[in-house]
Amino acid sequence: MPHMEDNGSEKEQLFLQHIQNLPQERLDAIRGHPELVLKEIDEFTYPDGSGVRMCIGDVKGGFIVGKIRERKPKIMVELGGYLGYSAILFGNEISKIPGGRYYSLEVNEDYAKIAYELVKLAGLDEIVTIMIGKACDSLVELQQKLLHKDLGFQALDMVFIDHWKDLYVPDLRVIESLNMIAPGTLLVADNIITPGAPEYHKYVNMSPEERRGYQAKVRNVNGFDFIGRWDLIYKTETKEFEGVIRNKHRKDAVDVTECVGYAKKD
């Protein structure tokens, strides 16, 4: 995902113009059909020959869709929405779950506006909520929103992490500190190999005692209020993917982490 200071680019605006300038007949054909909107994104090519960047794609995306179908999460959150590809892909699956809601957190207002237009075009705007701002701030807002909206809210069912890599751990510690992770919560993190998220991979594979030491030593850039929860027991599996994407050979992996319980406190 783009860096926090990235205020958008001409490329993303070109893509939005492409969608807005589609013939009315084509717009009518894809409206309300998430799979056709995704196809439009997949097939779009910029003048320089490149495609829309930072999309989860059908291979890794299909793997995560399988997890959604298996777990049937009612509340799913993504960190890093970009132009809405994953929100449409995963939000479409969430729409099949009674009471399901998908929250997409995106720091860049320009990207979020484009994502909203695409989500609306896909007919998922009543399922997908796009929140603009730093993930740490939006997570606090979301927690209060869910507590107010649903008195029975306990924790998030599923979290998809795909934003700025050096914020994977700090923002996960925010989620932990807000008590939004409980046994059964599933964390799915993209780009573990390319471009790489080694600190996150290490963190979710730590024992509770190792995580307690880490949290005591490493200050969270999001603030002292978000030290994290060392007593959460995580079980992590890494799924590797390899193949050719737009004529480039790529290798990547997704970390799938489940909270399976609590460690006993001293």
From Swiss-Prot:
S-adenosyl-L-methionine binds at I56, E78, S86, E106, V107, A135, D162. Binds 1 Mg(2+) ion per subunit. Substrate binds at K165, N191. It catalyses: a catechol + S-adenosyl-L-methionine = a guaiacol + S-adenosyl-L-homocysteine + H(+). It is found in: Cytoplasm; Nucleus. Signal peptide: none annotated. Its cofactor is Mg(2+). This is Probable catechol O-methyltransferase 1. It comes from Schizosaccharomyces pombe (strain 972 / ATCC 24843) (Fission yeast).
